[in-house]
Every structure is written in C-alpha cells, then in structure tokens.
C-alpha cells in the first residue's frame, strides 16, 4: 500500500492528545506539575492509546470522539472514549492567568438564577465532586430550557 495513503488512513483513524495551551507547571500552586504530568501525560495518553487500539475494524473506526461517546454502548470503547473526552474538556478549560475569578455575563446571570449565588454554586459543585467515590467527573451543564444543572458521573 502507498505510504502516503497509509499515513492518511492512520491520521483519519487516530485520536490524538490535545495540546495543552499552557506549560505543565503553569497552573501551580493550584495544580502541580506532577499532577499534570501524571493525569495528562500518563492517564490521558493511555486512554488515547487504548481507544486507537480498540476502534480499528469497528463501526467507530472513522468516527469523531463525540460521536463515539454518544453512540457506543457501555464497554471498553465507550469507557476510553469517554475518558479522552472528559480529560480533554478538563485540561482545556484552565488558564494560568485567568482574567477574573468569577464568571460574568450570561453565565453569571444563569448561575445566580439557578443557584442563588456564585458562592452557592461553588458549594453545590464541590459537594457533588467530593461526593464521588473513587474517580469520576462533576459537570455544570445546561438543559434544552437553559437551566443549569450539576451532574456527576463515575469513571468515564
């Protein structure tokens, strides 16, 4: 098979690590370089590698990550894709030099409307995250009516 064609096929089938928009030590002292190195460099890389090893020859072979998470049944493909998506969202939301410490605009208004205050939101969000046994994810999401919800999910 042509090397260029093979390379293009691998590029289409391969899920890649997101590039961090900051240095691995840029979030210190809130998140240590050791934590970033471990969770980004080891955990996330393992999930990406696992996903790339699992999808060839399946209906998910040429699917994007969101489609895989939305359509794959519980199992190894779903779990690894879910962890890749969750870790990617997690790591890409941070900034070493945030411009403000609280949300503004429409998000701030929605938080005040649905949680009473930003302080109440933080308390509820932290309680949801701390209430997870083992590994998992706490998310702020919005429903089709625009109402904010805190959800938590174990693992992927």
Model-derived segments and spans:
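Positively charged n-region of N-terminal signal peptides that target proteins for export
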Residues: 1-4
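Feature for soluble, non-membrane regions of globular proteins
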Residues: 6-8, 12-156
């Amino acid at each position: 098979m042509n090397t260029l064609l093979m390379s293009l096929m691998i590029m289409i089938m391969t899920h890649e690590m997101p590039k961090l928009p900051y240095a691995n030590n840029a979030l210190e002292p809130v998140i240590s370089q050791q934590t970033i190195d471990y969770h980004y460099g080891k955990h996330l890389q393992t999930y990406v590698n696992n996903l790339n090893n699992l999808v060839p020859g399946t209906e998910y072979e040429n699917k994007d990550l969101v489609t895989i998470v939305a359509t794959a049944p519980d199992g190894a493909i779903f779990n690894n894709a879910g962890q890749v998506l969750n870790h990617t969202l997690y790591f890409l939301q941070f900034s070493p030099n945030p411009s403000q410490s609280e949300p503004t605009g429409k998000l701030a208004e929605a938080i005040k409307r649905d949680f009473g205050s930003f302080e109440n939101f933080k308390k509820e969000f932290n309680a949801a995250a701390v209430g997870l046994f083992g590994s998992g994810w706490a998310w702020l999401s919005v429903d089709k009516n625009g109402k904010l919800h805190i959800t938590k999910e174990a693992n992927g």
